[in-house]
């Protein structure tokens, strides 16, 4: 496994502390025979526990090793995956390089953990390769991501070669995108101690759809027409929703995002004190192949407001 991972090119820029990189180090020791058995088992257990943590957060099931590798491919923002974002793969020499990477990933999918389990007297890889997750309520994990990971994982398991693997992964990039913006519908801004910001996905946003909103037909039509123009790259307007609390303003936005997520619509929610980041936020997202709603709620200005 160490040799396979070390030969990755487009997908080879690994964080040294990532699960995949650490698994490569573990198997490098095993494959050379330069290891202490107790220490190696401890290292393996550490990485398996990390896989279980990711599996719990995102509701993985069945083969957690396959689910993790699939999640890694979905989240990997590299020059190739970014060019495939919402458009799919184009013809070019880079495809051959990527197919080489996908041949390695197929080998990782099909990796036989039997020898290392036998030599070390462990069975953790067998356990996570045939895993039955505890049923969890939707709010306890990211269901939206879980469904996508498990679906693509099954397609990659069935891939006969690197070309089918390539088609499945790039098909996902075309349908949804790549990285956190591809997998998630909506985001908040978190302030950092360094005076900057990070994007944080909003997990399990209400699944309300426009048809669930009774009444407001004229308002809904205006929202739909404006949103459809926006996602199609046509001229669209900024929108101000106003009304008493509980009249459906926030719910309408959630419904719009749910309805047009597959068309590349995403939402970023920012608060009044975060307006100072607005130009930086736009700079971060302007080259991504999505359409972003910048959602500003509770803009409460009073006559004595200093700002």
Question: What spans do the regions from the language model cover?
Answer:
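Walker A/P-loop
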Residues: 239-265
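AAA+/P-loop NTPase substrate/partner-engagement loops
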Residues: 259-289
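N-terminal pre-Walker A segment at the start of P-loop NTPase domains
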Residues: 208-227
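Phosphate-binding P-loop
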Residues: 229-236
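Walker B catalytic acidic pair
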Residues: 297-298
